[in-house]
């Protein structure tokens, strides 16, 4: 079977797990793709909350003092790779000190330094953000093969879907953004 041409850049798009996803880490997942190139892909799961820790508890563990009322930034299971590392997906209005944020497009940026957590705790962070612990990563051709196998749907990301929807509603909202009802999806895929 010939592999479809999936060489276009999916950076800034969403991956939506199909109902038949067998890997429990990705079942029901919505992943924001931060980087996609022919050699690799990296994304953050944006709809699986970390039950074990809140943003406030994480700030306490990192000895980051809170000034006033610390916003309750959602903390997500970002993926199974390097779960001790955190990434903040945020609106591009934030300019980090020192290192540059990875500007994904005109609506999204990502920062992986402690500075952003300190700034959020101090009330100087981005207007919109979520924190992901860990990430999802793919090697050369791996993501393209998974998409061709119908493991994932792709959709446009919007700040409203990424930052404003409740985590438990993001999968449904992402599917609905494609123009159909999530109940119409089958766990079985076919090829003509």
Swiss-Prot record:
Gene3D superfamilies in the record: VC0467-like (3.40.1740.10)
Pfam families, sorted: DUF179 (PF02622)
Disulfide bonds: none
Gene Ontology cellular-component annotations: cytosol
InterPro entries recorded: AlgH-like
Alphabetized NCBIfam families for the sequence: PRK00228.1-4
The family this protein is said to belong to: Belongs to the UPF0301 (AlgH) family.
Listed name of the protein: UPF0301 protein Jann_3896
Organism encoding this protein: Jannaschia sp. (strain CCS1)
């Amino acid at each position: 079977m010939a592999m479809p041409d999936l060489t276009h850049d999916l950076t800034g798009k969403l991956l939506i797990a199909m109902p038949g996803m067998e890997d429990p880490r990705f079942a029901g997942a919505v992943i924001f793709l931060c980087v996609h190139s022919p050699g690799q892909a990296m994304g953050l799961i944006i709809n699986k909350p970390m039950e074990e820790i809140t943003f406030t508890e994480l700030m306490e563990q990192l000895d980051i003092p809170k000034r006033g009322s610390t916003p309750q930034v959602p903390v997500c299971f970002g993926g199974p790779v390097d779960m001790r590392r955190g990434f903040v997906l945020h609106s591009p209005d934030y300019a980090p000190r020192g290192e540059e944020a990875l500007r994904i497009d005109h609506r999204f940026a990502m920062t992986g330094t402690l500075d952003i957590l300190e700034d959020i705790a101090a009330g100087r962070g981005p207007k919109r953000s979520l924190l992901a612990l860990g990430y999802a990563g793919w090697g050369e051709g791996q993501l393209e093969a998974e998409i061709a196998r119908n493991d994932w749907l792709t959709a446009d990301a919007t700040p409203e879907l990424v930052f404003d929807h409740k985590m438990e509603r993001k999968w449904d909202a992402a599917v609905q953004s494609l123009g159909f009802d999530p109940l119409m999806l089958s766990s079985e895929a076919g090829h003509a």
